[in-house]
A protein has these predicted regions:
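Non-catalytic DNA-recognition/assembly elements of restriction-modification systems
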Residues: 1-60, 181-191
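Sequence-specific dsDNA recognition surfaces
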Residues: 40-57, 72-101
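Flexible loop/N-cap segments at domain edges
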Residues: 69
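A short beta-sheet element
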Residues: 95-97, 101-152
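A short glycine-rich beta-alpha junction/loop motif
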Residues: 128-137, 166-191
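Polar helix-capping/helix-linker motif
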Residues: 152, 156-160
Length: 191
């Protein structure tokens, strides 16, 4: 079993960022002039505490800052959004934002005594480092292109789980170690 896991990790490491970039070029996904992907978005880390109203971002000038949403604001979920990118006025708008502007979601374990997944959103910028907490249990693409890329290049099996009604794309089970071996640049904002 350990040998199989090692092979899987090696396979994913070899198929990481370069493979996703090559796939993007062949499918017409947006690619920067220097040939790099503009960003890959993750949902990562521990949940924020629920609040009755949204709180302002830490720093409006900082792309890494975010706003908090209460669990009532987004169908029982708790999210953190990068600042300056969305005026959250309705659940529909929130869902559209997640589905359209982020390529990948990573989902936390359910919290004790709660029926909801609790997640937060990260926008990855080139050259930053990805840190994946141990409580991450799944990775989920939020666009068809990334879904196909993950399936084709990482050979992941779909568990068919979904995070509420945000997007019908499958959830792919993957270990923390395997996610880290992807070596995709980025940074967790909810430390």
């Amino acid at each position: 079993m350990e040998e199989e896991n090692k092979k899987m990790d090696m396979k994913i490491e070899a198929k990481g960022t370069e493979a996703l970039l090559e796939y993007a070029k062949t499918t017409g996904m947006q690619v920067n002039e220097d040939g790099s992907l503009p960003f890959i978005g993750f949902v990562v880390g521990k949940p924020f505490k629920g609040k009755s109203t949204m709180t302002p971002p830490r720093n409006k000038e900082d792309e890494g800052s975010y706003v908090h949403l209460s669990s009532q604001d987004v169908t029982g979920e708790e999210f953190a959004y990068p600042s300056g990118e969305l005026d959250v006025r309705s659940n529909r708008e929130v869902k559209h934002y997640i589905a359209q502007d982020y390529d990948v979601l990573i989902t936390n374990r359910k919290t004790k005594g709660s029926a909801d997944y609790r997640v937060s959103i990260l926008r990855i910028k080139p050259g930053q480092k990805v840190v994946i907490p141990d409580n991450v249990i799944a990775i989920r693409p939020t666009c068809p292109e990334m879904s196909t890329a993950l399936r084709d290049y990482l050979n992941l099996e779909s568990t068919r789980e979904q995070v509420r009604n945000l997007n019908p794309s499958p959830v792919y089970s993957i270990t923390t170690k395997a996610i880290q071996s992807l070596k995709i640049p980025g940074e967790v904002i909810d430390k």
